[in-house]
C-alpha cells in the first residue's frame, strides 16, 4: 500500500493523498445516503451506510486511502453520555461532566462493547476496499473529547474546561485518564477489525498555552500512541494537533506521522520535525474553490517536500461547498505532479 509505505518514510512512486472529511457534504452521493439514514448519528450507527460513504471518495475521487466514517464523540456517547446533533448548533451533551459522581457513571468497558457498529463498518469496508488502498481508523484526542464532555458542546472560549484546568486540575486529569483508557481499547478494536493506520485528531489543541497543552493535551496523546505502538508496531500512527506551530520544537513521541495544519508554515514544520517524522498536509482548504489556487498550492508544497517523507492532505477538513470537480482535480494534480519528485 503506497499510503502505508509513505507513513513509514519508504520511497513511493508518487506522493499519496487523501483529505480530512473526504466522506462529507460536498459529495451529492454522501448527502443521498445521509438523507436515507435520517440524521448524522443514525448514519454513524448504520454500518452498511457508513461503509458506503467511507468508500465513496475512493471510487469518485481516486484518493489513496479511505478513512472510516464516524465521529469522535461516539466514544463519550457510548460511555453513557446523552448526545444530540442540533442543526445550527452542532453536538450537544445534555449533562456535562462536572463532578466525580457524573464521571464515575461513565463506563470504559460499556463504550468499547457498544461501539461494535464502528468495528462492523471497518470489517465491511475492508472487505470491499481494494487491497492496494489503506483504511484509516481514528479517534479524537483526549483533550478535545474532554472539552465537549465538560462544556456540553462546542465552545469558542473553553472557559469551563480552562477553569477546571487551573482550579481543579486533579479532576481534569481524572477525566482525561478515563477517556484515554477508553481510546486505547477503542483504537485496538479498530485495528483488530482491519484498519491499516490510525489518526488522532486534537482539533482544539490551540485552546491551551504551551505548558498547559503539554501536560493536559499532548502527554495523553503520547500515552495513547505508546500503547498502540507497543501492541501493534506495524500500524502507523498519525497525530494531528491543530494550531500548535508556536512550540513544535517541544513535540515528540513514538508516532510515525505528524499532521500539519494549514496555519503552520510547512517549511518550518519540515525543519523542526521532518527528520524525525513523516509530515502530512497542509494545503489551505479554501484553495479548492479555484483550480489556479490548487495548482499554486500543490506546486508550493511539492517544492518544499520534494516527494519525500510526505503525505499530501489539506490542512483541515474539506469544506461542504467545494465543487466535486475541483476535489477531483486536486487529487489528480498531486498524484501526477509529485511523480517527478519521487524518482
Swiss-Prot record:
Tell me, how does this one assemble? Homodimer.
Indicate where this protein is primarily found: cytoplasm
Q: Which organism is it from?
A: Campylobacter fetus subsp. fetus (strain 82-40)
Sequence positions that bind substrate: 21-25, 71, 148, 203, 316
Q: Would you identify the family this protein belongs to, as annotated?
A: Belongs to the uroporphyrinogen decarboxylase family.
The pathway to which it is assigned is:
Porphyrin-containing compound metabolism; protoporphyrin-IX biosynthesis; coproporphyrinogen-III from 5-aminolevulinate: step 4/4
| Function, as annotated | Catalyzes the decarboxylation of four acetate groups of uroporphyrinogen-III to yield coproporphyrinogen-III.
Question: Which reactions fall under this protein's catalytic activity?
Answer: uroporphyrinogen III + 4 H(+) = coproporphyrinogen III + 4 CO2
* Name of the gene: hemE
Return the EC number.
4.1.1.37
**HAMAP family from the xrefs?**
URO_D
- Cellular location of this protein? Cytoplasm
One GO MF term attached to the UniProt entry: uroporphyrinogen decarboxylase activity
The cross-references to Gene3D superfamilies, in alphabetical order and at most eight, read: 3.20.20.210
Q: Identify the GO cellular component terms for this protein.
A: cytosol
Name of the molecule in the record: Uroporphyrinogen decarboxylase
InterPro entries in the cross-refs: UROD/MetE-like_sf, Uroporphyrinogen_deCO2ase_HemE, Uroporphyrinogen_deCOase
The biological processes this protein is annotated with in GO are: protoporphyrinogen IX biosynthetic process from glutamate
Q: Which domain of life is it from?
A: Bacteria
Q: Where is this site: Transition state stabilizer?
A: 71
Q: What's a Pfam family this protein contains?
A: URO-D
Going by the UniProt record, its keywords in alphabetical order are: Cytoplasm, Decarboxylase, Lyase, Porphyrin biosynthesis
PROSITE patterns named in the record? UROD_1, UROD_2
Amino acid at each position: 500500500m503506497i499510503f502505508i509505505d509513505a507513513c513509514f518514510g519508504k520511497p513511493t512512486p508518487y506522493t499519496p493523498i487523501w483529505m480530512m472529511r473526504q466522506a462529507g457534504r460536498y459529495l451529492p452521493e454522501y448527502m443521498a445516503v445521509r438523507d436515507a439514514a435520517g440524521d448524522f448519528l443514525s448514519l454513524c450507527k448504520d454500518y452498511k451506510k457508513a461503509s458506503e460513504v467511507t468508500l465513496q471518495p475512493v471510487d469518485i475521487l481516486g484518493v489513496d486511502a479511505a478513512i472510516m466514517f464516524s465521529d469522535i464523540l461516539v466514544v463519550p456517547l457510548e460511555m453513557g453520555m446523552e448526545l444530540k446533533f442540533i442543526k445550527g448548533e452542532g453536538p450537544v451533551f445534555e449533562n456535562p461532566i462536572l463532578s466525580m459522581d457524573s464521571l464515575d457513571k461513565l463506563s470504559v468497558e460499556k463504550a468499547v462493547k457498544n461501539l461494535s457498529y464502528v468495528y462492523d463498518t471497518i470489517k465491511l469496508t475492508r472487505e470491499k476496499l481494494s487491497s492496494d488502498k489503506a483504511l484509516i481508523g481514528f479517534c479524537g484526542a483526549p483533550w478535545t473529547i474532554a472539552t465537549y464532555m465538560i462544556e456540553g458542546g462546542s465552545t469558542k472560549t473553553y472557559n469551563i474546561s480552562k477553569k477546571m484546568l487551573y482550579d481543579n486540575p486533579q479532576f481534569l486529569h481524572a477525566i482525561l485518564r478515563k477517556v484515554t483508557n477508553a481510546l486505547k481499547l477503542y483504537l485496538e478494536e479498530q485495528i483488530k477489525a482491519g484498519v491499516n493506520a490510525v489518526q488522532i485528531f486534537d482539533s482544539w489543541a490551540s485552546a491551551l498555552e504551551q505548558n498547559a497543552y503539554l501536560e493536559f493535551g499532548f502527554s495523553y496523546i503520547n500515552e495513547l500512541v505508546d500503547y498502540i505502538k507497543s501492541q501493534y508496531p506495524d500500524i502507523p500512527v498519525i497525530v494531528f494537533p491543530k494550531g500548535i506551530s508556536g512550540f513544535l520544537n517541544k513535540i515528540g513521541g513514538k508516532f510515525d506521522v505528524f499532521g500539519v495544519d494549514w496555519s503552520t508554515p510547512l517549511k518550518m514544520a519540515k525543519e523542526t520535525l521532518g527528520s524525525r517524522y513523516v509530515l502530512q498536509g497542509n494545503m489551505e482548504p479554501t484553495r479548492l474553490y479555484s483550480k489556479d489556487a490548487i495548482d499554486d498550492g500543490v506546486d508550493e508544497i511539492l517544492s518544499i517536500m520534494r516527494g519525500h517523507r510526505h503525505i499530501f492532505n489539506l490542512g483541515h477538513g474539506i469544506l461542504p461547498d467545494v465543487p466535486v470537480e475541483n476535489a477531483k482535480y486536486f487529487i489528480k494534480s498531486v498524484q501526477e505532479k509529485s511523480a517527478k519528485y519521487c524518482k
